[in-house]
Design a protein with these regions (language model features):
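A conserved ligand/cofactor-binding region detector
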Residues: 1-272
Length: 272
């Protein structure tokens, strides 16, 4: 799974010895290798907006093989493309405000997150990606194995490549509990046997963390689940005799921030 970025990363140019970045409008050229699957869309729900996730399939071929893999890429589209009433009231910018906010989600890979608005967009991207993908995985499981999701992990393994998709952990918990009726213990059993995590750095400044306020603003329910994971983690560490200072350092939530790597380490069955 991935996201279908309109401009990708950037088109590189060197001028006077310096790199210049320009939009890479690759989709505007004919590109026949992505197939739109509009009938298989999913709805991703933020507290301030709902977004349509439209899947596109890209074939992944190998040399000398007899099969072809599929990479499913999600494009973000608004629920309503155009606010006619706002436009007719001559509030022209307002008429496309929601549309452009949604398109921002899949506009550029790694948008600048030096500001709070940039951080909000980064986290939106991450949640949009994991929510749409997990909804599809659950639907596929139910179609093949029925509605009892307690064996979901028997047929699905999800590799978290770095911290960017770690929001999949609380999102899978939310889907299992809120959408499909599992209790916390059953949902946690499934989740902790579904995810494996690849850690790319031990440098503290490179480990991804986000302000608590971002979670509270974008998805309060995910914040509640992360808080509960943190509470249970602390009880678990105390029961194992881990000293409080060490337990606090590795806790999923501390010092006003959500620590994505520590969530991944605590909730994954394998780490490399």
């Amino acid at each position: 799974y991935g996201l279908l970025y309109r401009y990708g990363l950037f088109r590189q140019e060197f001028k006077d010895g310096f790199q210049r970045e320009h939009p890479d409008a690759w989709k505007e050229s004919f590109y026949p290798f992505i197939i739109r699957r509009g009938s298989e869309q999913r709805i991703v729900k933020f507290d301030d907006m709902h977004v349509r996730a439209i899947p596109y399939d890209m074939p992944i071929t190998g040399y000398g093989t007899d099969n072809v893999g599929t990479l499913r890429l999600w494009d973000a589209l608004p629920m309503h493309e155009f606010d006619y009433d706002a436009f007719n009231s001559q509030r022209f910018a307002d008429a496309i405000l929601e549309r452009e906010a949604v398109h921002d989600i899949t506009r550029v890979l790694y948008p600048n997150d030096s500001t709070y608005a940039g951080k909000l967009l980064r986290v939106r991207q991450q949640y949009f990606f994991v929510s749409a993908s997990l909804q599809e995985l659950i639907d596929d499981y139910r179609a093949a194995h029925g509605d009892d999701l307690r064996n979901f992990h028997t047929f699905n393994a999800i590799q978290l490549n770095d911290t960017h998709p770690v929001l999949g952990i609380p999102e899978l918990m939310r889907l299992l509990m809120d959408e499909h009726g599992l209790g916390w213990d059953d949902a946690w059993e499934v989740t902790t046997h579904t995810f494996a995590y690849t850690n790319h750095t031990v440098l503290q400044e490179a480990l991804e963390t986000w302000e608590e306020s971002i979670f509270k603003q974008l998805f309060w329910r995910i914040w509640e689940i992360v808080e509960e994971i943190d509470r249970r983690y602390r009880l678990d560490m105390a029961s194992r005799g881990i000293d409080p200072e060490t337990a606090h350092y590795y806790s999923p939530v501390h010092d006003g921030r959500v620590h994505m790597a520590w969530i991944a380490c605590y909730a994954s069955y394998s780490i490399n």
